């Protein structure tokens, strides 16, 4: 990325974090319109890396929306997949309720577990 961005656009930097485009919302709709959704998903699934599972953000962080609703991750938030069966506000949460709670997953989760993994801090392994 650093080489291409410098060559094409003259952009120079010390650090670059890249995250996988999740096949949800606008990007998912774009892929579907172009007939590329299944190919993209197959690529993510075929590159699943079990070593990424301990480092995915949903294992240690939650996402809170502007109304105080709790989600396992930013992507679940965009899909309105609440952490609990019923929406819960952060001010109603007893923190211990999160310990051992199941993480809601979907096909989009392969985006964080493909290859070297993906998170806001960069690759996972």
Q: Which residues are covered by each model-predicted region?
A:
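Short, surface-exposed linear patches
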Residues: 3-5, 38-41, 59, 84-86, ...
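C-terminal accessory regions of radical SAM enzymes
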Residues: 45-76
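Generic hydrophobic/packing signal
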Residues: 25, 56-58, 81, 123
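Flexible mid-to-C-terminal extensions adjoining Fe-S/redox cofactors in radical SAM and related proteins
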Residues: 70-125
